From Swiss-Prot:
Keywords: Cap snatching, Endonuclease, Eukaryotic host gene expression shutoff by virus, Eukaryotic host transcription shutoff by virus, Host cytoplasm, Host gene expression shutoff by virus, Host nucleus, Host-virus interaction, Hydrolase, Inhibition of host RNA polymerase II by virus, Manganese, Metal-binding, Nuclease, Phosphoprotein. It comes from Influenza B virus (strain B/Lee/1940). This is Polymerase acidic protein. A motif (Nuclear localization signal 1 (NLS1)) lies at residues 125-140. Coiled coil: none annotated.
């Protein structure tokens, strides 16, 4: 029965039916016949509503008669069935009050705007007349009745309420369902709607009425007063309730979508008067510089690891006369430098732990004592100087070249690997051999990808940060930013990318913020792309000789903050691997099913029959750039990492809203002729998410490029079609 229901009814109808059952604590899996009855009942209500319309003067039209006049028509019937029970009652009372009629004692299924009458719809396995009189006895004249039977008969209290076509459609659908059920031997197990209705009607006496009035919560004098308050309150269901009331006034005109109707999103990202989007990731990525120290591969305490790395690069460790290269707007460079020196001294001193003294500059950097003071509501009301702070709307920014550069650098191969994955036991079943082979190819490609090194740095740092935040809530702690890499020869190196300072971390809630000051090494001169670094204060602290060449070393300092949720996600950053690998594995599986054998090796390297697979991985000078299967895997993995690193509400909103546009473009490509309404509203929903998130702005830029290419392609196809027609 479950499969039958899924196959024969729309998903929205099934979901509403399940919600209705949930309100009565009924289980759809245990009572599939009840679920079926509710689905049929809902569908009949929608069929009746979809077939009948009214114009502004109240004249009735069928769906066929109303073609071409859709702008001036509205549904004749309001569908109440399928709404959550409390909202349905609110809508029913509102409609009764609006049209000056008495509210029925029972919930109706439909409301007729022409006759201003509520309607009960019934479906029965027996005779329609028998069920009609059962309903009539229960409901009296409080509402009209529309009863339909699987036996191809019907009974209406008002014959003019439904035309012949409407009756025919309902009865045809019931016949079709009965035939399908009989074919699958399910007809006999189905119980009729009339058999599951159980109820006892009784008159509300004076005693019970008094008890009801006494039982209302404090603040209400009687039951009717409480009901009136509930009807007018603005709870979470306010949107649904108001929409239900507005439905007769709403006119939606679908329009067939053409390529010309689609425009680029976020035009402000090309506005050169706006500032470039700044770098705001928690840690440096492609600009990082790790101080390497060869190790035997044994595990070490973070402090020991950092101390050994600093000892190897003593000129950087002992630097006391830095050169200020760049200063962020609110930074105090003297305080930041003194805090850095305290961090170095703490790490270098074997006798102390990694706790910092609470100096005035440490308090400034960690924001100690700058938290908002909570004021009780009663006090705030009496104080005229107290007011609600205006919400801060993010400033709009334009696209910056550094985002694409980060993407390119992170998806390249390096000579070191940092990926730390658990070992898997030996294969047992044949399918495990395929899995191991596939995993080997995937991991080899990802292992030496720059993005995997950055990912592991995030994982290790957030793990240490969360541990310290929980273990030392009232202390300032130095946390080394470290990683361990292995080169192609199998030699292990400890890497120190910088140091961080954790402020006080009494994190009661998941969103409570802990201040983190980061000090990171880099060989990138910030003046080369100054628009990227407005959030950083940068010092030049010396130089290193790499391959016989002197490279300057800069210290990037930033006051930042995070919370438990973000730290937990940082610890789980390895999930980025899953999404990218699953995406590529789906392609391998598809190829394997076509060829009839495992195509893992063929996709990566090719075989005697097939060349290695290639994919479009970007554009260059307006043309698509192809890349190998492995390169495509690394690009998708890097995108997953960037999605995590720059993830916020803007990105969530953009991903959800832009998906609709992508589906429309795909439908146009497939020549399915999509219809839309309120396209500008969809664009508004997308564009309000494009503010100052680097990944969102870059994604919008890529979307516009892709849209341009698809539009050009559609013109070529149209010209080919014209030639073929001639």
């Amino acid at each position: 029965m479950d499969t039958f229901i899924t196959k024969n009814f729309q998903t929205t109808i099934i979901q509403k039916a399940k919600n209705t059952m949930a309100e009565f604590s009924e289980d759809p899996e245990l009572q599939p016949a009840v679920l079926f009855n509710i689905c049929v009942h809902l569908e009949v209500c929608y069929v009746i509503s979809d077939m009948n319309f009214l114009d502004e003067e109240g004249k009735t039209y069928t769906a066929l008669e109303g073609q071409g006049k859709e702008q001036n028509l509205r549904p004749q019937y309001e569908v109440i069935e399928g709404m959550p029970r409390n909202i349905a009652w609110m809508v029913q009372r509102s409609l009764a009050q609006e049209h000056g009629i008495e509210t029925p004692r029972y919930l109706a299924d439909l409301f007729d705007y022409k006759t201003k009458r509520f309607i009960e719809v019934g479906i029965t396995k027996g005779l329609a007349d028998d069920y009609f009189w059962k309903k009539k006895e229960k409901l009296g004249n409080s509402m009209e009745l529309m009863i339909f039977s699987y036996n191809q008969d019907y009974s209406l209290s008002d014959e003019s309420s439904l035309d012949e076509e409407g009756k025919g459609r309902v009865l045809s659908r019931l016949t079709e369902l009965q035939a399908e059920l009989s074919l699958k031997n399910l007809w006999q197990v189905l119980i009729g709607e009339e058999e599951i209705e159980k109820g006892i009607d009784f008159k509300l006496g004076q005693t019970i009425s008094k008890l009801r009035n006494i039982s209302v919560p404090a603040g209400f004098s009687n039951f009717e007063g409480m009901r009136s308050y509930i009807d007018n309150i603005d709870p979470k269901g306010a949107i649904e309730r108001n929409l239900a009331r507005m439905s007769p006034l709403v006119s939606v005109t679908p329009k067939k979508l053409k390529w010309e109707d689609l425009r680029p999103i976020g035009p402000h990202i090309y506005n050169h008067e706006l500032p470039e989007v700044p770098y705001n990731a928690f840690l440096l990525m492609s600009d990082e510089l790790g101080l390497a120290n060869m190790t035997e591969g044994k595990s070490k305490k973070p402090k020991t690891l950092a101390k050994e790395c600093l000892e190897r690069y003593s000129t950087l460790r002992d630097q006391t006369d830095p050169i200020l290269i760049m200063k962020s707007e609110k930074a105090n460079e003297n305080f930041l430098w003194r805090l850095w020196r305290d961090c170095v001294n703490t790490i270098s001193n074997e006798e102390t732990g990694n706790e910092l003294q609470k100096t005035n500059y440490a308090k400034w950097a960690t924001g100690d004592g700058l938290t908002y003071q909570k004021i009780m509501k009663e006090v705030a009301i009496d104080d005229e100087t107290m007011y609600q702070e205006e919400p801060k709307i993010p400033n709009k920014c334009r696209v910056a070249a550094w985002v694409q550069a980060e993407m390119n650098l992170l998806s390249t191969l390096t000579s070191k690997r940092a990926l730390d994955l658990p070992e898997i036991g030996p294969d047992v079943a044949p399918v495990e051999h395929v899995g191991s082979e596939r995993r080997k190819y995937f991991v080899n490609e990802i292992n030496y990808c720059k993005a995997s090194t950055v990912m592991m740095k995030y994982v290790l740092f957030h793990t240490s940060l969360l541990n310290e935040s929980n273990a030392s809530m009232g202390k300032y702690k130095v946390i080394p930013i470290t990683n361990r890499v292995v080169n192609e020869k199998g030699e292990s190196f400890d890497m120190l990318y910088g140091l961080a300072v954790k402020g006080q971390s009494h994190l009661r809630g998941d969103t409570d913020v802990v201040t983190v000051v980061t000090f990171e090494f880099s060989s990138t001169d910030p003046r080369v792309d100054s628009g990227k670094w407005p959030k950083y204060t940068v010092f030049k602290i010396g130089s290193l000789f790499v391959s016989g060449r002197e490279k300057p070393v800069y210290l990037y300092c930033r006051v930042n903050g995070t919370n438990k949720i973000q730290m937990k996600w940082g610890m789980e950053a390895r999930r980025c691997l899953l999404q990218s690998m699953q995406q590529m594995e789906a392609i391998v599986d598809q190829e394997s099913s076509i060829q009839g054998y495992d195509m893992t090796k063929a996709c990566f390297k090719g075989d005697r029959v097939n060349n290695p697979k290639t994919f479009s991985i970007g554009t260059q000078e307006g043309k698509l750039v192809k890349g190998s299967f492995g390169k495509a895997l690394r690009v998708i993995f890097t995108k997953c990492l960037m999605h995590y690193v720059f993830g916020n509400a803007q990105l969530e909103g953009f991903s959800a809203e832009s998906r609709r546009l992508l589906l429309l473009i795909q439908a146009l490509k497939d020549r399915k002729g999509p219809w839309v309404f309120d396209l500008e509203g969809m664009y508004f929903g997308v564009e309000e998410c494009i503010s100052n998130n680097p990944w969102v702005i870059q994604s919008a830029y890529w979307f516009n490029e892709w849209l341009g290419i698809e539009k050009e392609g559609s013109k070529v196809l149209e010209s080919i079609d014209e030639i073929m027609d001639e």
